């Protein structure tokens, strides 16, 4: 079972980097009140920790989006399931994401937000899986550059499980979970896996 998962990022490494991102946002938005927009559900744990590291006034909003597969359309069709109700015109908005890979969903969301006459719009992502990018996305605040592997934990899920893990784990082969959906649960019950190579910190 040693091939079920390995640690990509330990809790301590995540918290250190989140603190650095929070301090950067604090400095960049001094004298302003940014609005952090979290995308449900994956970004909630990252958002909660990030908020604690921002040393100034800040507001929070939530959105939920979904992507539906469509054979004639690469990446599928995106739909907003839960929108922001109040007017954000003139506000400084930071979209908080757990992970950005192809950029298709985020690109749709950013285009939607830009139509609201914002004062400014930036992106803060814990993980950037840039080698999967299809649509160019400018991410001002990046936690780590993520390898091209499936990851779970710290808000990231597989079939709604494992969001509550304080670490981020790599699942090298999805075939294991396809044949046994409980394989990772069984593995974790015996203790967390050994540390693997960490993701790269974005400088």
Task: Please describe what each predicted stretch is.
Residues 1-203:
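PRPP-associated nucleotide enzymes
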């Amino acid at each position: 079972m040693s091939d079920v998962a390995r640690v990509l990022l330990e809790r301590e490494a995540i918290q250190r980097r989140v603190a650095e991102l929070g301090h950067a946002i604090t400095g960049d938005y001094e004298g302003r009140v940014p609005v952090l927009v979290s995308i449900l559900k994956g970004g909630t744990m990252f958002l909660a920790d990030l908020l604690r590291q921002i040393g100034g006034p800040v507001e929070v909003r939530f959105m939920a989006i979904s992507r539906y597969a469509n054979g004639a359309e690469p990446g599928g069709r995106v739909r907003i399931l839960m929108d922001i109700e109040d007017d954000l015109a003139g506000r400084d908005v930071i979209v908080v994401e757990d992970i950005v890979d192809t950029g298709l969903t985020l690109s749709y969301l950013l285009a939607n937000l830009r139509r609201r006459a914002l004062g400014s719009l930036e992106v803060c992502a814990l993980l950037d899986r840039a080698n999967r990018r299809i649509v160019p996305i400018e991410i001002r605040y990046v936690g780590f550059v993520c390898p091209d592997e499936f990851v779970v934990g710290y808000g990231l899920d597989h079939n709604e499980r494992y969001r509550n893990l304080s670490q981020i784990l790599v699942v090298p082969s999805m075939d294991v979970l396809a044949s046994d959906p409980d394989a990772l649960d069984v593995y974790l019950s015996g203790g967390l896996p050994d540390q693997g190579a960490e993701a790269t910190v974005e400088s």
